[in-house]
């Protein structure tokens, strides 16, 4: 579609200077970071990408799923919580084909010495995006999102934003670099058993969890989550096999969940214990997570459970870090 200055771009400079966008999905801990040079100096938008999930998103996954990007022209105003966002200057789906990225509805052109505000996310499906209407609310856009019911259906939602990008008069245009960040909380569970006993674990489940929420952009590559108000849901977790009395964390099996306060959250676990081929205990236990840290945007958490043989308390620890490392949480299992 023709997006030249004669087609409603307002004060866009008549020299058709292409907007080149670099989508550098620089996800913490990702070893695949690709830099792409703009293939030409024309007006066509080009994207660069690098990624890490449902297995963690990787570069091939991003090329397959693409991403959604919005841009707003705020003229002389810089982005803030009080700025009014007009009709999107760009509202497009970025797709990868023939070794390059293109955005639907393009090409797009730089306005001279005016501020463009960029907001992007991936995957494109499952997101309901809302920009402030400029009358009853202003400032940053937001979107609602619901995670899948199982780990296999959950995707590694990532977001990016760039504030106040400009093409100055008599200066060459530079790429707009979108640095994507993980927007969910990644959750894993590890179990330690008593040595010398055989444990058969039939159920591990996170309960009292909000499955949807609203993400509001705030600043560059930042934002806040508000958990949904719907009835809490449960998510089954699949443990890895025992090795040296401890379960392994299975690759690609992490839960990707909405960041939230753990007001009613619990881990439910059912297991039997055998000794020398004879069953000696059958347990159904719950571990409260209310005293552990809230789930934060872009964090990775590991809950480490110590399961007793019988009617003793289950120990638990928890740690939280950025996406590149996994912190254990060790709560007590009653």
Predicted regions located by residue number:
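Contiguous ligand/interfacial binding patches
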Residues: 203-260, 272-278, 284-289
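Single conserved hydrophobic/aromatic residue that forms the stacking wall/gate
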Residues: 1-13
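C-terminal motif of bacterial Sec signal peptides marking the signal peptidase cleavage site
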Residues: 27-29
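Hydrophilic extracytoplasmic domains
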Residues: 278, 283-334
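Sec-dependent N-terminal signal peptides
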Residues: 17-24
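Short, intrinsically disordered, charge-biased short linear motifs at domain edges
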Residues: 15-16, 43
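Short, low-hydrophobicity acidic/polar segments
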Residues: 32-200, 205, 233-244, 248-251, ...
